[in-house]
Amino acid sequence: MAAAAAATAAAKGNGGGGGRAGAGDASGTRKKKGPGPLATAYLVIYNVVMTAGWLVIAVGLVRAYLAKGSYHSLYYSIEKPLKFFQTGALLEILHCAIGIVPSSVVLTSFQVMSRVFLIWAVTHSVKEVQSEDSVLLFVIAWTITEIIRYSFYTFSLLNHLPYLIKWARYTLFIVLYPMGVSGELLTIYAALPFVRQAGLYSISLPNKYNFSFDYYAFLILIMISYIPIFPQLYFHMIHQRRKILSHTEEHKKFE
């Protein structure tokens, strides 16, 4: 669900309602009141740091590939910064909760927690999947997406958004979104036999709480949930792309 959740930011006309870390209406169709000066300064710093963090991950991947001459098991070269910066996105829930970013707390929580779940409850917890190529697949998709997304928010907050970044934000998802979803699904699928064998995070009866939980079945349900969500969200994003970029082109004609 991580790519699907993160992509909802782009599906709304302004990349998440100005939301997850940005401000303003990226479509340019109407102006929204942004955060105050102090909040804006903080958000700019936050987005710059997050952009830099994902750039560190990108550079780490490239350096590891050049050193090894292979793309296998590159996850280990960027494991720590990936965990740090993806977990750092939890601050975006706080941004919404205190009102400095005009996005839904519930939607933002879903977006952020789905990725944190995949990082910690799947990839970190099931060591055997960390060398899978599918992990690299979603890591690359996330990395490119986040560099663009945080750059987009930074320039939007500064009221100086280059068209190239706007175009990249509303175009590259066409490839990155399916790529990320594929990596996520394959990683969860690869984790299933190990989760079942170890009984990871599962609670069986009898116990004093009279409660049971099957983590293996839970992961299967998560995978099934991609079926209705992915196509609906993907085509909605395509529709939003046409609307937003066509508006930009029309605006340029009148300048």
Curated annotation (Swiss-Prot):
Catalytic activity: a very-long-chain (3R)-3-hydroxyacyl-CoA = a very-long-chain (2E)-enoyl-CoA + H2O; (3R)-hydroxyhexadecanoyl-CoA = (2E)-hexadecenoyl-CoA + H2O; (3R)-hydroxyoctadecanoyl-CoA = (2E)-octadecenoyl-CoA + H2O; (3R)-hydroxyeicosanoyl-CoA = (2E)-eicosenoyl-CoA + H2O
Transmembrane segments annotated in the record for this chain: 43-61, 81-98, 109-126, 132-147, 171-188, 219-236
Record: glycosylation sites: N210
GO CC annotation terms, alphabetical: endoplasmic reticulum; endoplasmic reticulum membrane
A single MF term (Gene Ontology): very-long-chain (3R)-3-hydroxyacyl-CoA dehydratase activity
Region (Disordered): 11-34
One BP term from GO: sphingolipid biosynthetic process
Pfam families reported for this sequence: PTPLA
Location of the active site: Y177, E184
UniProtKB keywords: Endoplasmic reticulum, Fatty acid biosynthesis, Fatty acid metabolism, Glycoprotein, Lipid biosynthesis, Lipid metabolism, Lyase, Membrane, Transmembrane, Transmembrane helix
InterPro entries: Tyr_Pase-like_PTPLA
Quaternary structure, from the entry: May interact with enzymes of the ELO family (including ELOVL1); with those enzymes that mediate condensation, the first of the four steps of the reaction cycle responsible for fatty acids elongation, may be part of a larger fatty acids elongase complex. Interacts with BCAP31. Interacts (via the third lumenal loop) with TECR.
Family under the similarity heading: Belongs to the very long-chain fatty acids dehydratase HACD family.
Name of this chain's protein: Very-long-chain (3R)-3-hydroxyacyl-CoA dehydratase 2
